[in-house]
Amino acid sequence: MKNLNGRTHNACYHPYYHQSLHFAQQQQQQQQHHLQQQQQHMQQQQQQQQAPQQQLRHQQRQLPTQPAYQQSQSVAHNAFPLRSSSNNYGHVASSAYAASSGSHNSNNAAAMAAVCQMQNFFNQQQQQQQQLEFNNNCMPINYYQQQQQQHYPSESQSSASGWNPETPGQAQLALTATTCNTTAAATCNTTAAATTSTTATSAAAGSDNNHSDNFAMDASEIATFLANELFLQQLGNFETGQSVLTLTTPTLTPTTTRNIEDTLGHLLSDTQTDRVAGCAGFAVPKVLPNAIDVLGMGIPTGVSSLPLQQTFDLSLGQGSESEDSNASYNDTQMNEEQDTTDTSSAHTDSTSYQAGHIMAGSVNGGGVNNFSNVLAAVSSSRGSASVGSSNANTSNTPARRGGGRRPNRSTNMTPEEEQKRAVRRERNKQAAARCRKRRVDQTNELTEEVEQLEKRGESMRKEIEVLTNSKNQLEYLLATHRATCQKIRSDMLSVVTCNGLIAPAGLLSAGSSGSGASSHHNHNSNDSSNGTITGMDATLNSTGRSNSPLDLKPAANIDSLLMHIKDEPLDGAIDSGSSLDQDGPPPSKRITLPPMSTMPHVHLSTILTPTGASSGSLQTPITSTAPGGFGSAFPVTSNGSSINNINSIGNNMNSPTLNAHNKVPKERPNTLAFQRPLGQMHLTMANNKAGGPTQIQGVPIQTPSTGTFNFDSLMDGGTGLTPVSGPLVPNSSSTNKHPLELPTPTAEPSKLVSL
């Protein structure tokens, strides 16, 4: 994560870190006071063993004070003065403060204590023998602690003779060495950084000393001292209640580990000749593979067990408290972004940023943790080979690609290469922008297409709903209309007429095919239809009286119908208000007919006026047998119904069927056609005598006293035989028809009764 200035992400949490340091300031001061008292106590013990050195130690105890330290820090603040004739301690303090100015007042006391301790070391080394020092450096630290605990007098004698180890607390040093192994991930980074900075500072101070030939301070002692300081700094952060996980403390990185290996590893393998050759008493570090082990167990015996003190990070600059982790990130991410696109504004080169704030005098331009530049500058008088090895170790770090976005800009990159990289980055930015735009456009097009399809689908769904509702309404109307529909349904018969007569069921197909010819040839008929009756309603074809349709309803029970017929006397005059009288002409136009027995074959033209004999009543009984002339002309069909053909010109039509090819124009009949009801009517003779009354289902049949003709029927071309009195034989047709539509001889001749 980068902040707005392109700095390291740890700078974002800078206030929290200083707050934790501010909370730890009081504890640091208390520990420093305690350590100073402990130092004084140990120095008193050493004065008893080393009487000649007591006065020197007394002077050393008075040297570094807080005001003097603050005055000397303004002398050299931003650089490491390696060669100068100014105050030695002022340079040491100012260098330490320049590296740790980000830690505010809490690091001032720690730096003061560190300077005091180093001054004690410097003065002690002037009176020590380097051979014993080398022997002590080769001993393990644990063995050294055991020797100090078990053989303190003998160790003190050896210290008096050559090497003077200050032993303020062996248990504390052991705790430090042990804890460095357990908490290496949290402390080794700051340990190495502080070790390097203070080592370089003390080396610079030692090189300025006039007695540099006799001065030979062991670098491992300084490293151990700073390790204790840094460990207690981390421990103080824990004690203040601030969690280390939330703070931006430096972490252990590969660069930090390598630097620790370089420094401490070479200190273990240092020789007397190298120590003599180097003015500061140590040589250029070399790479060793075990850094953590060196920190934990490999610290030489000559390391002074310094007092426990809350430490400070000497390698931090003003800009950030974690520049070392930033530099290690840069080392591992060398040249990461050469072929990538970086659109962020935080493309600041971190190495140059660090060099501007911390390593202003650096030659090789490495990061903060690459403190071998300082060591190379200190040992610049030693030889070009050592300096070359240092440069090879620091500036020629191989690139490690482990992810991330911030690259390390190479220091030796030419302006042309930088310009090419900038152009390449701009091209990548433009290409990425075009790619994003294409994706956005494609997404928008697909979205619009989807919206159109959704709208179309919605409209289709609405249309389907409308059509479904319409279909349901039509089905409902059809279902409700079917119960009251007057048209014939598909399961009913189709009736065909021929010359106004109804054809039998056997010729329905022929009649339907010849219905057109029937309507053209039948000029004398009153047929107003096209020859086919397609309905159940009797009023469809009732315009002509000679074309009454066939009632297709099933025949009701005649016996039950006859029981409801009212028995009325038929001898008297017919009431003008009767239903039968309404069908004929008025009484003034009616003519009387003579009895049928006197004129069986009288032509209609001979009937002019009623005769006197016609006044008598007609008591002609109905015989049980039909006349011989009617038998062949009106045969009885198998279903109990008969078809009567009127033949008045001698052309007998004996065929039981009628079709359109056998039509003959109708003429006025001169006889009354009578058909005895068979099958549907059960005639019972009361007696077989002539003139006996005939009964139909127990009802006597009587003829009227005077038979009358229907004058209107005669004028219309009919037979004029419309009955005006007398009981008619009830049938299914007469029970359902309107009184104006009673049977006529042309329509249903079989339903007439002889008068």
Curated annotation (Swiss-Prot):
Region of interest (Leucine-zipper), residue spans: 446-453
Residues of the bZIP domain: 418-481
Tissue expression as described in the entry: Early expression in the embryo is mesodermal and some of this expression is localized to a region surrounding the cephalic furrow. Later in embryonic development expression is ectodermal, corresponding to muscle attachment sites. Also observed in part of the mid- and hindgut and in the anal pad.
Compositionally biased residues, Polar residues: 316-333, 539-549
GO cellular component, one term: nucleus
GO term, biological process aspect, one: wing disc development
Major location category of this protein: nucleus
Modified residues (Phosphoserine): 548
Comp. bias intervals (Low complexity): 23-66, 149-159, 341-350, 383-397, 510-531
SUPFAM superfamilies: Leucine zipper domain (SSF57959)
Keyword line: Activator, DNA-binding, Nucleus, Phosphoprotein, Transcription, Transcription regulation
Region (Disordered): 23-75, 149-168, 316-350, 383-440, 510-552, 716-755
Compartment(s): Nucleus
Record-linked Gene3D superfamilies: 1.20.5.170
Disrupted gene: phenotype observed: Loss of isoform A causes embryonic lethality.
Any one GO MF annotation of this record: DNA-binding transcription factor activity, RNA polymerase II-specific
UniProt region (Basic motif), positions on chain: 420-439
Role this protein plays: Developmentally regulated transcription factor AP-1 binds and recognizes the enhancer DNA sequence: 5'-TGA[CG]TCA-3'. May play a role in the function or determination of a particular subset of cells in the developing embryo. It is able to carry out its function either independently of or in conjunction with Jra.
Additional comment: Mammals typically have four copies of fos, Drosophila has a single gene with multiple transcription start sites giving rise to multiple protein isoforms.
Family per record: Belongs to the bZIP family. Fos subfamily.
Subunit structure: Homodimer. Heterodimer with Jra. The kay-Jra heterodimer binds more stably to the AP-1 site than either of the two proteins alone.
Name of the protein in question: Transcription factor kayak, isoforms A/B/F
Source organism: Drosophila melanogaster
